[in-house]
Amino acid sequence: MAHKKGTGSTRNGRDSRSQRLGVKRYGGQVVKAGNILIRQRGTKVHPGNNVGRGNDDTLFALIDGIVTFEYKTKSRRKVSVYPVAAE
């Protein structure tokens, strides 16, 4: 007879990798063309001036400039990138 109890195995201990969604560059930050501004599912925030939208609704800068968050309408937000004024 066994003198030790057999240890049972657990069926827990797995979880899926999070999707790392959210705002990646905030208002007032300087960005380069191609920088990802927001990773999102659906168009929570819409693309504004000089901002492109990827197949997965990711928003990215089309030009070098400063990020600004604005409202298209009362409830619809957009993000734009405006060029830095040359001094």
Swiss-Prot record:
Family the entry assigns: Belongs to the bacterial ribosomal protein bL27 family.
Instruction: Name the UniProt key words of this record, in alphabetical order.
Output: Ribonucleoprotein, Ribosomal protein
**Superkingdom, taxonomy of origin:** Bacteria
Question: Organism classification, top ranks?
Answer: Bacteria, Bacillati, Cyanobacteriota, Cyanophyceae, Oscillatoriophycideae
Question: Is Metal-binding one of the keywords UniProt gives this record?
Answer: no
GO biological process, alphabetically ordered: translation
Q: Please provide, in alphabetical order, the Gene Ontology terms of the cellular component aspect for this entry.
A: cytosolic large ribosomal subunit
GO molecular function list: structural constituent of ribosome
- In Swiss-Prot or TrEMBL terms, this protein is called Large ribosomal subunit protein bL27
Q: Where is this region: Disordered?
A: 1-24
The UniProt entry, under Pfam families, shows:
Ribosomal_L27 (PF01016)
PROSITE patterns per the UniProt record, alphabetical: RIBOSOMAL_L27 (PS00831)
